[in-house]
Structures are given as C-alpha cells and as structure tokens.
C-alpha cells in the first residue's frame, strides 16, 4: 500500500496540476483540443527561414470565425471587425481538412454570408463558384485542369455537392458537372438551411 501524501506533497501536486491545461478543452468540457501531429524532417531544410516578426492569429479565434461563418453573418462580421485578417484564415480540423469562413459558408449554401465575406476580400475558389452558380468560372477552372472534377473541398465535399447546395441558382453548374462526370447524387442535407427563413409578415 502506498504511503499517504504529506500536506506539502499534496500542495505541490495540486499547484502543478493547476498549471497543466485541461484535456477537456476548457471549463465547458468540450473535449480535447487539437493536437499537432508529430513531425521530423527527413529531407533538407528549405533555404529560406521565416522571420516570424508578427504573431500568428489565435487558433481559437480562427476556429470561432470559421464556425460562425457557416451560419451566422452577424457574428462573422463582428469577428472580422475585431480582426480583419480572419477573412482568409483557415482552420485545420484534423488530417489536413482545411476550411476558411468562405469554405464553410459555401458548403452550407449560404449565399448571403458568401457575399459578405467576398466584400471583405475573401479569396473565391472553385467550390464557392460552383455554389454561387458561376458557370463560366467553373468551366474555366476545369478547362485549366480537368482532374479538378474530382477535387475535394472542406470535409471532402465535392464540386457536385457545392453546386447542389446552391439550389436553383447553380442548376446550370450542376448540369455541367454531371455532363463531365455523372454522379448518383443523394439529397443534400444542407439544402434546406441554405438560406435563412424569411420573417413572417
């Protein structure tokens, strides 16, 4: 049987535990936070070394912005007012599943949020163009590289998925994508939430 801890030993352990971040991801017990994968170079280092003169954006702030940009335009704008550099910040949800606020709004079919983000300088991509019904842009991208028909956006969502969630405004894009590669499309779970409900008169 182990000897009982002295008061001094107990106090030392308690103080040390207070300095260790909780594995529960904060007081609300939201689960463990992100963990960076282990890595060691097995190739020569690049000849250029970053100076890191400016601090990186806070990861929690980036996470919150990207999440709000999926469905809450007011909060997205509020966070952009607080930190304009969030507009093109990307969150790695794990294993290289990168997502920006624009990517989140796009795969949710939220044209209203996409328009806000574009006004703030978000970098439009092929997935956003597909959702917005920008047929010429999608055609140009696929002409540049036909294999982009199989490209995956945030969470693995395809170009077809983005065109589908765009609804009627992107039917032409979806028809074009289907003419290149016919997919058996399942009902899009985000289509019903693509636009906010209109207030009752």
Describe the predicted segments one by one.
Residues 54-67, 88-104, 123-130, 151-165, ...:
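Ankyrin-repeat boundary/"N-cap" motif
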Residues 173-201:
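Terminal, low-structured helical/coil segments at or just beyond the last alpha-helical repeat
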């Amino acid at each position: 049987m182990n000897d009982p801890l002295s008061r001094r030993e107990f106090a030392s352990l308690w103080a040390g535990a207070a300095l260790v971040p909780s594995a529960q991801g904060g007081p609300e017990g939201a689960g463990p936070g992100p963990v960076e994968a282990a890595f060691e170079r097995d190739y020569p280092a690049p000849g250029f070394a970053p100076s890191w003169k400016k601090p990186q954006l806070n990861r929690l702030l980036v996470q919150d912005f990207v999440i709000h940009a999926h469905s809450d335009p007011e909060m997205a704008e509020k966070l952009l007012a607080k930190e304009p550099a969030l507009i093109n910040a990307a969150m790695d949800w794990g294993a290289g599943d990168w997502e920006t606020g624009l990517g989140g709004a796009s795969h949710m079919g939220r044209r209203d949020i996409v328009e806000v983000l574009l006004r703030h300088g978000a970098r439009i991509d092929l997935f956003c163009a597909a959702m917005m019904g920008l047929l010429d842009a999608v055609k140009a991208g696929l002409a540049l590289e036909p294999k982009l028909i199989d490209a995956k956006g945030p969470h693995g969502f395809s170009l077809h998925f983005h065109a589908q969630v765009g609804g009627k405004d992107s039917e032409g894009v979806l028809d074009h994508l289907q003419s290149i590669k016919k997919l058996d499309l399942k009902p899009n779970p985000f289509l019903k939430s693509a636009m906010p409900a209109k207030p009752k008169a």
